[in-house]
Amino acid sequence: MKRMHKNQKGLTLVELLVALAILTVVAGATNAVIIQMMQSSRTSAHMVAIRQAQSAAYRINCDALQAQEVKVNNSSSGFPLILNWTTWDAGTTYQVTYNLVNPLGDLYELQREEIVNNGTPLTTIVGQYIYRGPEPPRNTSCRWDNTTYVLTLNITTKAGQEVEARTYKIKPRPYVG
């Protein structure tokens, strides 16, 4: 075995073991941070998908509950969805149209256009990341049943790789003519 002289530089076994232990702790912490960042991004995308589905359904639900007349397109999506009603107290007429617009691949925005007393249309976007594409997942669509008077709304949103699908059944107020 070779002897080390006093001026000779090198690491002892204890120093190597301490360095290895520190390196292991740093690598473990780095790995945990990377996993947390990936999970956080996925959770954030999932929350965006849920919130967009809920927001779009909420607006359609509010208008559909008031509707005295519901019209859906005969296309596979059922859009545009047109809701008409007249208020009982003031006789104000409303026409609200929902349509899927501004496609970016399979993702659309849900546009709401409101016309009060045949006036100027007010247009807003009430939902984003609305999915209409090859299945799966299920496509966004709406259907009106003339027998049961129920509007069935299927909303699918996709944010990143996260997909959220919801089905709503809405029964508008009865029309008394």
Where does each model-flagged region fall?
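N-terminal cationic leader/targeting segments used for protein routing and processing
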Residues: 3-7, 118, 147
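Residue-level recognition of strand-loop junctions within catalytic nucleotide-signaling folds
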Residues: 19, 84-86, 158
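Type IV pilin-like appendage domain
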Residues: 73-146
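Aliphatic-rich helix starts adjacent to a transmembrane/signal segment
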Residues: 2, 8-61, 65
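Short linear sequence signals and composition-biased patches located at protein termini or domain-edge surfaces
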Residues: 131-177
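Short, well-structured beta-strand/strand-turn elements
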Residues: 65-74
